[in-house]
Regions:
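Basic helix-extension-helix modules of the SAP/HeH family
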Residues: 1-112
Length: 112
């Protein structure tokens, strides 16, 4: 997932990004069990990034959730604001994965 996050970050760096790319990035993130272990984790992400709140039944199915989020992204007006928030989120996940990788390497060094 680390390589995909790097690609997403590079796409989000562009000044103008088409909505279909934002939809693709968000869909990949929502479907990833490495980024969101539990469906309940997605709820905070959607509130922070897009300001979206859905009923509880939608969070039982990631595919239903993606359909609703896609619908909202298509109708949204503040593309740049959401793109910047999404960029910060992806960058945070990249940093988190780097830190986890370093910790694993440090633990293995003790055994050698």
């Amino acid at each position: 997932m680390y390589k995909e996050l790097i690609l997403f970050r590079n796409e989000l760096k562009n000044k103008s990004i088409p909505k279909y790319k934002i939809i693709g990035i968000v869909s990949e993130l929502l479907l990833s069990k490495q980024v969101f272990l539990k469906n309940s984790d997605i709820e905070d992400f959607l509130k922070d990034i897009f300001g979206l709140e859905f009923k509880a039944y939608l969070f039982k199915s990631r595919t239903l959730l993606i359909a609703r989020v896609t619908k909202e992204i298509i109708s949204m007006e503040k593309d740049n604001e959401y793109k910047n928030k999404l960029y910060k989120f992806v960058q945070g996940k990249i940093d988190e994965l780097k830190d986890n990788e370093r910790k694993e390497k440090n633990q293995l060094d003790g055994w050698i």
